[in-house]
Amino acid sequence: MAGISETGHLKVVTNFESLITSATAFGESYNPSTAGIKLLALQTLLTDSKASIDAVNIALIAYSNAVGVREAVFMPFSKLITRINSSLKASGATVQVINNAQTIVRKLQGKRAGTTLNEEEIKALEAGGDVVNQISVSQLSYDSRLGNFDKLITLLLSVPLYNPNEEDLKIESLKTLYAEFNARNNDVLTASIQLSNARIARNDVLYKPLTGLVDVATQAKLYIKSVFGATSPQYKQISKLNF
């Protein structure tokens, strides 16, 4: 299941619908004693399967939209941090405060205190199976950005000299912006959970042992094979439908 693409799941459902079409066309010859593969049961399972596919598609669109909104909200973030940093430096704050701020700013902008990895860092990364020249040492995940932005605001609150005239750099404005960032990040988290739940439900309908579409379809194919024979045109009609 994990390796099946969204189109792969849809193909399984499409093949199942073709199987039902063939079984229906067989007329009275398709008359299984097993309740789970009777035509009415197959039609019900097909309806549920299509609904589960639709639910994933809807959740996927909602997730993509939430990600897009979050990206748009965060787009000016790095430039804002640069302006905050410059304003703090111009405020007359102590060297210690400035240095503390730089640690946070580097994390927010994905910059290291040093420009190269030392030998111990390289060995540690290689031991973990990482390719050193592709290692990202930034902390640019959205959760990390939010955490570090909150730390920066807390630091600014402790600096009486940080009192810019620029409205968007004022601490209250930064708090409001943080709340907006956090809300949009939570929107993505919520959408991702809903998408995950939709996929779990779909996988249950399609792949649950015995009652899922795949096992039911396989059982129906075996029944058709038993009725008409392995070399019959009826069985050949459905034998290439993969599940």
Model-derived features: where do they sit?
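Basic/polar low-complexity intrinsically disordered segments
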Residues: 1-243
